[in-house]
């Protein structure tokens, strides 16, 4: 379930909200031959044709699984169903004509990560994707850059809805000397962990008192440990793992670094900025939307680790510059507060109900 990890609830959910494990509606397709056809298509894209479209519609999601979802949605008599991410957006698009509810596809990553990267969910299936997305009553995306991509490529009119910043109870950083922080899922390709190691090595050459907190867990955890050992960085890097209080680490940081190859939004960026921590990140849709370059952080051309490290070093060596950018970061983070995002969320729901 999306609200659990290793059997533990990640978020506090109001008791009035009923949770349904969607695995109960899914069908095991592990041994179906079509599974291998779709896996091959993610590398070659041969199904993206007029002839391939019927096959995709009939086989990508099992008929029994679609039937289970249709029966469940209609039985519950929902007014609106929001599909979070590309998979559930496509599902809702397929079954739209068979359910009574209004449907919204809420995209939580970038257009290119969903559709243009080999191996991505929608890679090589763009005719199918366009048909599914155009059937929905609304598409929400995270940034204005994504809106341009989704709209121009899919022929839709999406709406931008930011992820709201979680509550920060007045936590402010003390700008501990030479201390930087990274927070995110430990996934080498996505989060650019190889670039992170490079950047830390280069910063250490200029800042001998450097210390680093790396917050998060993921499939590349062991790989990262080995890389840090090989680079002789183990003594200055603290692998925090998962924590329920990230603010205790932001409260010491002088700079946050974000090395992702792609980033749909960047909640950790906002969390750090709300504590007064300036952020250095590679240009990406999310960081570009949040960070005002040279005002509350720095945006670096992909994937220039020399320039990245140099900007971090500048901030670590210029206390007044760092503090001024930190003040601007706090100010910017308020643009993403729940008080600002929630009214837009409500308005978009109302517009979906009215067919706007």
List the model feature ranges, each with a label.
Residues 1-56, 149-151:
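N-terminal strand-loop element at the rim of the active site
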Residues 57-70, 80-100:
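An aromatic- and histidine-rich active-site surface loop
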Residues 67-74, 111, 120-139:
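Membrane-proximal helix-turn-helix segments that form the acceptor-binding/catalytic region
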Residues 102, 130-169:
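Donor nucleotide-sugar binding/catalytic pocket of nucleotide-sugar-dependent glycosyltransferases
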Residues 172-191, 197-200:
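Conserved donor-binding/catalytic core segment of Leloir-type glycosyltransferases
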Residues 242, 261:
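Aromatic "clamp/platform" in nucleotide-sugar-dependent glycosyltransferases that forms part
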Residues 278-281:
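Short hydrophobic beta-strand element within catalytic cores of glycosyltransferases
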Residues 293-294, 298-305, 314-319:
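Conserved acidic donor-binding segment of nucleotide-sugar-dependent glycosyltransferases
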